[in-house]
Amino acid sequence: MKQLLLSFLLIFFLSDVAVAKDSFSSLSEAQVKSLVCRKWKLTFLEYKGKKKDIPAKVPASYLVFLADGKLQEFEGSKKYDGTWTYHHETKTITTIDQDGTEKHKIISLNSDQFVMNGNYKGFSFNMGFKKAD
């Protein structure tokens, strides 16, 4: 009975992951851009499989992707402007801002959550955002 339950849970988990992956990969370029264009609040960072929530005492960080290709970054009371482009074939967003030019692979995206990868001084990590608008 335990093996049956374990098998069922494994199949359920794998099918759930496949559906989630397919739902993002089946979106058109216009649909992805429409989902990206909003205000996002940074809620977690993930490095080497370890997820760390952003503490409430840390000043909030936001990204605002505008439909005209402009990008606004807010870190506490500081604001930085930049630009962004989306590349549908590779599911990447390229940003140009005070940190230079960076390419971010979209890991997951829906109307409430957005996860993309980032790099800092040679370290690759994932950034998780929640819809803020």
Can you describe what each PLM-predicted range is?
Residues 16-81, 88-133:
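Lipid interaction determinants
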